[in-house]
Amino acid sequence: MYSIEFSQLAEKQLYKLEKGIQLRVLNVLERIRLRPFHFIKKKRGTPYFILRIGEHRVILDIHPEKFIIFVTELGHRKNIYD
């Protein structure tokens, strides 16, 4: 099972979201810990992956050799790709 770690930026972005959305993001991250590659999509031109949660996106850096899912950034889809 993978462990989940957050960057400082991702932590700040998470706490800026509404409480209901925060809980939804954390619940989905907890569910993907077992098989993360089943739920994500590769972000073009980068080594990162995208997890879609409604209208929000979570940018992930996955290290399969260490079993770590590193959350680099998250937010609403209209702002996350800038």
Regions flagged by a language model, labelled:
Residues M1-E5, L9-K12, K16, G20-L23, ...:
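Enriched for short, Lys/Arg-rich terminal
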Residues V28-L51:
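A short, surface-exposed loop/turn module that caps and links secondary-structure elements
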